């Protein structure tokens, strides 16, 4: 086999997810076992995703990986754990067309090339590591003919990045903390698919696409060691919220969903403040967006928009339907207009058909926006240009898929090197 020069590869696409009941804190740092259950919404991979190509060849002399075009080291324990677990479950692979035959036992000796690309900022609080590790595990499982269901694969992805386990499903997903020491029961399960509640529209305000000062990994460790609020949250608060959130999702009860999502996001950031030294993930712009949503929800009498923030300043806003999303976007663009030379289609990305519905497909549209009547005196004037880098409009989406179109592959099919 060593003299052969074939390259066998698979390309896959995996979504990212946003937690509505947060995961913050591990009880086991090595196996990545959380101190509480969490629930997330998978975001439409058409707008936010990781694409990964994995290749195997007898010509490769070592495992190599490229992330967003730059070669990175695979020596870290998280990558090694994922690679070891997947290789240990590999099956026989045969490609009659190319005359390739890989026996189960051969996988230990063969080296891999991996290329991965996020279509959104890495490490800025948009769960890029979640999509990345989920995509790595999913694509390798397809390459190596691993016969496991997504929940079993989620336990492997979890060892790369905790929230990655939730990106192996579409729709609404629960990561069960489990109780076993080996982590075998700490897996993700789908609560409902993406079609279950398809009225929802999600707008993300990318407040900063810079890398954050405190990584989630070190932030969590410090919170577990120093925050009494985290202990109270994990034991007393989250178990009840998980049950309530499951019920809200099942019944498409937006009022309960909003109340739980917003309070859980705020408590997560309170835990960060209760950490010693305190961790600040949100900034003034984040706080202004919260004020905007809170005032609007109160003025309407029933919740129209839920907000949630992960470990970063970006706001994820979930509107109850398309009509509300149009009004929300108009309000956001009134308070956070683009700089004067910005093309609207690069300021609102993803599903930007919403711009037309909001009457904002021309640059002059923003200048003609009226302040939302119920909140115009309370948020500040329309002078916040540049506070938001851009907006992403999306919705709940599907889980991972294999991309069969070779033009989408990130590695050259002849050499197995990045294109």
Curated annotation (Swiss-Prot):
Keyword ATP-binding: yes
Disulfide bonds: none
Cellular localization per UniProt: Peroxisome
Residue ranges of the motif Peroxisomal targeting signal PTS2: 40-48
Encoding gene (name): MVD2
Pathway: Isoprenoid biosynthesis; isopentenyl diphosphate biosynthesis via mevalonate pathway; isopentenyl diphosphate from (R)-mevalonate: step 3/3
Residues forming coiled coils: none
Subunit and partners: Homodimer.
Species, as recorded: Arabidopsis thaliana
Family of the protein in this entry: Belongs to the diphosphomevalonate decarboxylase family.
Enzyme class: lyase
Any single biological process term in GO: sterol biosynthetic process
Chief place where the protein resides: other
EC number: 4.1.1.33
Cited function: Performs the first committed step in the biosynthesis of isoprene-containing compounds such as sterols and terpenoids. Is specific for (R)-5-diphosphomevalonate (MVAPP). The catalytic efficiency with (R)-5-phosphomevalonate (MVAP) as substrate is 10000-fold lower than for MVAPP.
Keyword field: ATP-binding, Lipid biosynthesis, Lipid metabolism, Lyase, Nucleotide-binding, Peroxisome, Steroid biosynthesis, Steroid metabolism, Sterol biosynthesis, Sterol metabolism
Binding-site residues for (R)-5-diphosphomevalonate, renumbered to this chain: 23-26, 78, 161-166, 217
Record's protein name: Diphosphomevalonate decarboxylase MVD2, peroxisomal
Superkingdom as given in the UniProt entry: Eukaryota
InterPro entries with a match to the protein in the record: GHMP_kinase_C_sf, Mev_decarb, Mev_diP_decarb, MVD-like_N, Mvd1_C, Ribosomal_Su5_D2-typ_SF, Ribsml_uS5_D2-typ_fold_subgr
Catalysed conversion reaction: (R)-5-diphosphomevalonate + ATP = isopentenyl diphosphate + ADP + phosphate + CO2
GO CC list: cytosol; peroxisome
GO molecular function: ATP binding; diphosphomevalonate decarboxylase activity
Keyword Lipid metabolism: yes
PANTHER family the record matches: DIPHOSPHOMEVALONATE DECARBOXYLASE
């Amino acid at each position: 086999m060593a003299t052969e020069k074939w390259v066998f590869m698979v390309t896959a696409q995996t979504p990212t997810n946003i937690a509505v009941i947060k995961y913050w804190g591990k009880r086991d740092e090595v196996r990545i076992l959380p101190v509480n259950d969490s629930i997330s919404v998978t975001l439409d991979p058409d707008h936010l995703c990781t694409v990964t190509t994995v290749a195997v060849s007898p010509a490769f002399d070592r495992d190599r990986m490229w992330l967003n075009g730059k070669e990175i080291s695979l020596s870290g324990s998280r990558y090694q754990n994922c690679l070891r677990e997947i290789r240990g479950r590999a099956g026989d692979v045969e490609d009659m067309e190319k005359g390739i035959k890989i026996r189960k036992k051969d996988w230990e000796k063969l080296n891999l090339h991996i290329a991965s690309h996020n279509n959104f900022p890495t490490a800025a609080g948009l769960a890029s590591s979640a999509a990345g590790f989920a995509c790595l595990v999913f694509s390798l499982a397809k390459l190596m003919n691993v016969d496991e269901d997504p929940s079993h694969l989620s336990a492997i992805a979890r060892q790369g990045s905790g929230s990655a386990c939730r990106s192996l499903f579409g729709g609404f997903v629960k990561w069960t903390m489990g109780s076993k020491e080996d982590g075998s029961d700490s897996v993700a399960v789908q609560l409902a698919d993406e079609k279950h509640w398809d009225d929802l529209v999600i707008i993300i305000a990318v407040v900063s696409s810079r890398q954050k000062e405190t990584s989630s990994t070190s932030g969590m460790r410090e919170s577990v060691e120093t925050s009494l609020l985290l202990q109270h949250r994990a034991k007393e608060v989250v178990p009840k919220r998980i049950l309530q959130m499951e019920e809200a999702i099942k019944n498409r009860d937006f009022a309960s969903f909003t109340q739980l999502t917003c309070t859980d996001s705020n408590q997560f950031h309170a835990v960060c403040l209760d950490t010693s030294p305190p961790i600040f993930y949100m900034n003034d712009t984040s706080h202004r967006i919260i004020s905007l949503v809170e005032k609007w929800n109160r003025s309407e009498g029933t919740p129209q928009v839920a907000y949630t923030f992960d470990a970063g300043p970006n706001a994820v806003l979930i509107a109850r339907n398309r009509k509300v999303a149009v009004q929300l976007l108009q309000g956001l663009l009134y308070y956070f207009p683009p700089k004067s030379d910005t093309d609207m289609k690069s300021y609102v990305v993803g599903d930007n058909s919403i711009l037309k519905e909001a009457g904002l497909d021309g640059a002059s549209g923003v200048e003609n926006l009226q302040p939302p009547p119920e909140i115009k005196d309370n948020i500040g004037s329309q002078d916040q240009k540049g506070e938001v880098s851009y907006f992403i409009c999306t919705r709940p989406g599907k889980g991972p898929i294999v991309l069969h179109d070779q033009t989408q592959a990130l590695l050259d099919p002849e050499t197995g090197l990045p294109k």
